[in-house]
């Protein structure tokens, strides 16, 4: 009788624990309601292809696979955890035909038509830059470009050495491997690189692009993996890491900013106003006022970094408004990242491209080039006054990934989303620097 009572108590405790288990903060029965609703929608192929339908699908899917990725041994430490799990599964759902066309359209409308990615990045840039000490921000930005250049030099040297080991000429290594990897992603990197290649050499842009995007895809995977590894190294050797802070404050003496008072929802709303208006101004400058400087196009996110930095330096924003912008940024990065990663997997990840590019030589060369970017940026950053881990992530890995979505994947893998502003400088301004280098390299081949 006693054994039966104990067994009954154990069963009740197990059931109670199961009911209290939470997925994305929701008790299991409540999440089950959301999941069953989504499955009904999938079964009847009835989902609105607007923001409501898209966000419902992205929230529910992101929640379950985020929890799995967060808990899965090895994957959560070495591969990138929840965010990487989410976008890989989402990409597989498209590849395997599990998603219906309506579901793909709903997510695509959120990501492409409504451009949720732009809003996400704009909010993170504003919160990240406004939360930095004004004088420290100026000094760090001035030192960041040389760190990017150090990363490019490191990637080039490592790439040339490994290329020669495979019998590949120096010009081909630079043209087909180093420049696409370090060029700022797809739209701001591989696409304009193929145009420059065609205009300078007269050769096929399509042939160049297909090779460049394959190499870039492999490098992006290594960038994510290395980001997770660098996070682990930073935890073991704490003197190498600023735990999300780029600048070694001992190297840049500054006075502390004034402390913020009470923060209300209104200050948080002002953070949204500043995020959207600064983005709007950056867009106008990039598209109409200064579409190019010296023949090189500057992306609107690069302009936005400079605009928000100028706003911070102007003293127009009170400590409360800065704190409100930071609170909004934290909400987006902590509560909406899993949602965004579903969209990244559906709209920006092609598993077939990854599979096609997986040759032994391509994998080894791409990996070594990314290592070179990390080493170069770490050494350059240390000499400037930055922490090696943070400088290698932002000026190294965020140069070697696939641009805006790659920045989010890399930073989420190493738990450093607050470094998004520096990541965007790498992807945008750094990508522009690579385009200039490409013009010179391609002209030498003619």
Curated annotation (Swiss-Prot):
It is found in: Cell inner membrane. One of its GO terms (cellular component) is plasma membrane. GO terms for molecular function: metal ion binding; organic anion transmembrane transporter activity; symporter activity. Keywords: Cell inner membrane, Cell membrane, Citrate utilization, Ion transport, Membrane, Metal-binding, Sodium, Sodium transport, Symport, Transmembrane, Transmembrane helix, Transport. It catalyses: citrate(out) + 2 Na(+)(out) = citrate(in) + 2 Na(+)(in). Na(+) binds at residues 181, 183, 399, 401. Citrate binds at residues 186-187, 402, 404-405, 428. One of its GO terms (biological process) is sodium ion transport. It is a multi-pass membrane protein. Its main location: membrane. It holds the Pfam family 2HCT. The chain crosses the membrane at residues 23-43, 46-66, 79-99, 110-130, 148-168, 213-233, 267-287, 289-309, 335-355, 364-384, 425-445. Homodimer. Belongs to the 2-hydroxycarboxylate transporter (2-HCT) (TC 2.A.24) family. Secondary active transporter that catalyzes the uptake of citrate across the membrane with the concomitant uptake of sodium. This is Citrate/sodium symporter. It comes from Salmonella typhimurium (strain LT2 / SGSC1412 / ATCC 700720).
């Amino acid at each position: 009788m006693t054994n039966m009572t104990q067994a009954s108590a154990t069963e009740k405790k197990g059931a109670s624990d199961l009911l209290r288990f939470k997925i994305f903060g929701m008790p299991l029965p409540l999440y089950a309601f959301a999941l069953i609703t989504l499955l009904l929608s999938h079964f009847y192929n009835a989902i609105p292809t607007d923001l409501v339908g898209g966000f419902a699908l992205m929230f529910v899917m992101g929640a379950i696979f985020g929890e799995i990725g967060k808990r899965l041994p090895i994957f959560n430490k070495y591969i990138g955890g929840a965010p990487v799990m989410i976008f890989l599964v989402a990409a597989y759902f498209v590849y395997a035909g599990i998603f219906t066309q309506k579901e793909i359209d709903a997510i695509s409308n959120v990501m492409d038509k409504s451009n949720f990615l732009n809003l996400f990045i704009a909010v993170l840039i504003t919160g990240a830059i406004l939360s930095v000490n004004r004088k420290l921000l100026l000094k760090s930005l001035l030192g960041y470009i040389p760190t990017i250049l150090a990363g490019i030099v490191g990637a080039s040297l490592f790439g040339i050495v490994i290329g020669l080991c495979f019998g590949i000429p120096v010009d081909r290594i630079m043209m087909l491997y180093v420049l696409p990897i370090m060029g700022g992603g797809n739209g701001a990197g591989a696409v304009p690189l193929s145009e420059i290649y065609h205009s300078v050499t007269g050769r096929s842009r399509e042939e160049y692009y297909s090779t460049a995007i394959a190499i870039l895809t492999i490098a992006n995977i290594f960038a994510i993996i290395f980001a997770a590894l660098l996070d682990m190294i930073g935890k073991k050797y704490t003197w190498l890491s600023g735990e999300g802070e780029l600048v070694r404050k001992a190297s840049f003496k500054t006075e502390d900013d004034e402390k913020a008072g009470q923060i209300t929802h209104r200050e948080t709303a002002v953070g949204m106003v500043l995020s959207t208006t600064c983005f709007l101004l950056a867009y106008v400058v990039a598209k109409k006022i200064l579409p190019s400087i010296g023949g090189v196009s500057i992306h609107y996110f690069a302009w936005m970094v400079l605009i928000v930095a100028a706003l911070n330096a102007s003293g127009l924003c009170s400590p409360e408004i800065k704190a409100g912008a930071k609170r909004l940024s934290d909400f987006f990065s902590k509560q909406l990242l899993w949602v965004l990663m579903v969209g990244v997997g559906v709209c920006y990840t092609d598993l077939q491209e990854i599979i096609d590019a997986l040759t032994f030589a391509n994998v080894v060369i791409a990996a070594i080039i990314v290592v070179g970017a990390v080493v170069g940026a770490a050494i350059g950053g240390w000499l400037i006054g930055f922490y090696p881990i943070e400088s290698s992530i932002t000026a190294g890995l965020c140069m070697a990934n696939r641009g805006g979505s790659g920045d989010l994947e890399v930073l989420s893998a190493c738990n450093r989303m607050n470094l998004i502003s520096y990541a965007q400088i790498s992807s945008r301004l750094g990508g522009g620097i690579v385009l200039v280098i490409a013009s010179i390299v391609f002209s030498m081949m003619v």
